[in-house]
Amino acid sequence: MTVASPALIRIAAALLIDSEGRTLLVRKRGTQAFMQPGGKIDEGESARAALARELHEELGLRVHPDAPAHLGRFQAVAANEPGCQVQAELFRVDSDEQPRAAAEIEALAWVSADETHDMVLAPLTRDVILPLYRDLLSAPR
C-alpha cells in the first residue's frame, strides 16, 4: 500500500524586520495562527515577484523584488490547509514603513524574539522562521 504525499503549496514569505529589531506577524481572516506575511507563488511567477505582490496586496508595502535578501527554502505542515505542506522561499525585508491590514489579513503584530510564547503560531513560523530570526539577531555584525 502506498501512502500519498501531502500536497505541497509553494509560498514566498517575508521575515520583515523594523529598526527596533521586531518582526511582523500576520493572521488571516477566519484563522487562528499568526505567520509571516507573504503568500502563494502563482504559476510562472518568481518567488521574489510573488513576495512583492503579496506585501503590496496584504499590507500596502512597496518592496522592489530585488531588494529582499533570500534566506533559504523551508518546509513545514501548512497552518490553514489540512493535509498540506508549505514550501516557503523566505526573504528578509528590512522596513520601517507602516503596514496596514488589507485583503485577507485580519490582524498584525510586531513582536520581538521573545514575545511569541502566548501566540498561536503557524508550524513554519514556530519551528523554522522564529528560531532563524533569533539566530539572525544574535549573530555578530
Specify the residue positions occupied by each region the protein language model found:
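Conserved N-terminal beta-strand and adjoining loop/helix that marks the start
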Residues: 2-23, 40
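A short coil-to-beta-strand element that immediately follows conserved catalytic motifs
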Residues: 62-72
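Short, low-complexity, intrinsically disordered N-terminal peptides in bacterial proteins
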Residues: 1-8, 133-141
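Active-site-adjacent beta-strand/loop module that shapes the phosphate/pyrophosphate-binding cleft
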Residues: 74-100, 132
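NUDIX/MutT-family hydrolases
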Residues: 90-92, 100-132
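Conserved hydrophobic "DFG−1" position in protein kinase catalytic cores
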Residues: 16-17, 25, 92-93, 110
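Conserved Nudix-box catalytic region and its N-terminal flanking loop in Nudix hydrolases
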Residues: 18, 22-58, 62
